[in-house]
């Protein structure tokens, strides 16, 4: 895919940004904890979340879909499927399903694409094995494909050494099948969509005031079925916020955006860098929803070292902002970036250098000198949707060619359409 330099300002109101991926995954998987019809409007119709629907269908759920409205009727009991459960590119789907299936009687095989099958799963499989789960796979169950022989699990008191919503949710789901009350704690607060959704479903879960500790009781009855409208994804919206900031005389309003405090850290970083950006809350249900207004801005360099778990998906796009800011910027304490869909630290630095930017890898992040003269280049996405979309936005300033853009469809199927509607010229 080739993106040409955009010569005109952008002025738009965007209401059709992709639905939130995290909530879409959880809606589908958590529906299996109920016994009545679950309904979601604005479900994300991307490859990752459609794969999750296919997984729960193979476990016995009935699914009705009309456009982005999805209805799920859960099975009376989970079936042992006669096929591999394909998670595609989604670490969320795989890690949550490991936790869900570990305590369910049956035999299950989880696999994914070549990128997912090389991402670490021991952070889930190890603690589950310690409480009685039977999980088998390459490199001591660290790499998929993974085979799970579900059975009753022992209660646990687990302290996670990493701040990860995927680890947390997997352990919550396993706790529902344990033989007694379980506790979970983490070193810093990760995304809390699971807790929010499960509390709305009347799950037997208690959350500490600081959100760091959970008490989970085994399920004694089905949870309350869901009927929700899924808000738009702030991680997807971030690319167009960045576009408005870096393109002269531009302004964009984005509506119905999820504004959960654990999801807007990257926006706060942009504000600290000098971005003219406002977030307004319009609705508070089980999640906070609102709109974002942003316009062209001059950015200043910044050091980012806190709340990294809250901006891990936006880090590649933040690196683009760093490259266009005045002065030096850095991101540290972000070693988790090395085990995402790609090694995002190495890949961002490699590709920024190709575009004329002075960038340096750190063990746990990167350092970028802003204000360098950009040059048109061909970059490699390494199959990582967030790398591809970040450099697509940079391409609006300097022109860019991306070697694998199909990966964008895993999370944001209408990204190219929106970019084109804003005036971008794109060749395939």
Swiss-Prot record:
Gene Ontology terms for molecular function: 3-phosphoshikimate 1-carboxyvinyltransferase activity
List of residues binding phosphoenolpyruvate: 21, 91, 119, 166, 344, 386
Entry EC number(s): 2.5.1.19
Family named by the database record: Belongs to the EPSP synthase family.
Disulfide-bonded cysteines: none
Job description of the protein: Catalyzes the transfer of the enolpyruvyl moiety of phosphoenolpyruvate (PEP) to the 5-hydroxyl of shikimate-3-phosphate (S3P) to produce enolpyruvyl shikimate-3-phosphate and inorganic phosphate.
Keyword Amino-acid biosynthesis in record: yes
Lineage of the organism: Bacteria, Pseudomonadati, Campylobacterota, Epsilonproteobacteria, Campylobacterales
Keywords: Amino-acid biosynthesis, Aromatic amino acid biosynthesis, Cytoplasm, Transferase
GO cellular component: cytoplasm
Pfam family, one: EPSP_synthase
The protein's name in its UniProt record: 3-phosphoshikimate 1-carboxyvinyltransferase
Positions contributing to 3-phosphoshikimate binding: 21-22, 26, 164, 166, 313, 340
Pathway linked to the protein: Metabolic intermediate biosynthesis; chorismate biosynthesis; chorismate from D-erythrose 4-phosphate and phosphoenolpyruvate: step 6/7
Cross-referenced SUPFAM superfamilies: EPT/RTPC-like
NCBIfam families: aroA (TIGR01356)
Family annotation (PANTHER family): AROM/DEHYDROQUINATE SYNTHASE, PENTAFUNCTIONAL AROM POLYPEPTIDE
GO biological process annotation, one example: chorismate biosynthetic process
Positions of the catalytic residues: 313 (proton acceptor)
InterPro entries linked: Enolpyruvate_Tfrase_dom, Enolpyruvate_Tfrase_sf, EPSP_synthase, EPSP_synthase_CS, RNA3'P_cycl/enolpyr_Trfase_a/b
Subunit structure, as described in the record: Monomer.
Domain of life according to the entry: Bacteria
């Amino acid at each position: 895919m080739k993106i040409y330099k955009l010569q005109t300002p952008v002025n738009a109101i965007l209401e059709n940004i992709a639905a939130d991926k995290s909530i879409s995954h959880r809606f589908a998987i958590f529906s299996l904890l109920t016994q009545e019809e679950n309904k979601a409007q604005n479900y994300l119709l991307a490859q990752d979340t459609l794969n999750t629907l296919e997984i729960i269908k193979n476990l016995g759920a009935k699914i009705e879909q009309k456009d982005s409205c999805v209805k799920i009727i859960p099975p009376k009991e989970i079936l042992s499927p006669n096929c591999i459960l394909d998670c595609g590119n989604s670490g969320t789907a795989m890690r949550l399903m490991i936790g869900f299936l570990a305590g369910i009687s049956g035999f299950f095989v989880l696999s994914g694409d070549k990128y997912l099958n090389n991402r670490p799963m021991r952070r889930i499989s190890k603690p589950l094995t310690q409480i009685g789960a039977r999980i088998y796979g390459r490199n001591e169950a660290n790499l998929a494909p993974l085979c799970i022989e579900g059975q009753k699990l022992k209660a646990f008191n687990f302290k996670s050494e990493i701040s990860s919503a995927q680890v947390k949710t997997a352990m919550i789901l396993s706790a529902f099948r344990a033989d007694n009350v379980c506790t979970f704690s983490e070193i810093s607060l990760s995304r809390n969509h699971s807790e929010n959704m499960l509390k709305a479903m009347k799950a037997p879960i208690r959350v500490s005031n600081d959100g760091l500790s959970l008490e989970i009781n085994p399920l004694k009855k089905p949870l309350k079925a869901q009927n929700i409208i899924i808000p738009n994804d702030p991680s997807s919206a971030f690319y167009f916020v960045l576009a408005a900031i870096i393109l002269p005389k531009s302004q964009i309003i984005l509506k119905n955006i999820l504004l959960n405090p654990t999801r807007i850290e990257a926006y706060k970083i942009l504000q600290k860098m000098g971005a003219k950006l406002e977030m307004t809350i319009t609705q508070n249900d089980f999640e906070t929803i609102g709109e974002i207004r942003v316009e062209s801005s001059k950015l200043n360099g910044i050091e980012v070292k806190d709340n990294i778990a809250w901006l891990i998906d936006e880090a590649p796009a933040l690196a683009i902002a760093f490259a266009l800011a005045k002065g030096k910027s850095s991101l540290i304490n972000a070693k988790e970036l090395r085990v995402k869909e790609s090694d995002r630290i190495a890949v961002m630095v490699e590709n920024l250098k190709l575009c004329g930017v002075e960038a340096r890898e750190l063990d746990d992040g990167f350092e970028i000198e802003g204000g360098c003269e950009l040059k048109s280049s061909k970059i490699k996405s390494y199959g990582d949707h967030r790398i591809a979309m970040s450099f697509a936005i940079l391409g609006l300033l300097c022109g860019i060619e991306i070697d694998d853009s199909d990966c964008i469809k895993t999370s944001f199927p209408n990204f190219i359409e929106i970019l084109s509607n804003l005036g971008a010229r794109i060749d395939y």
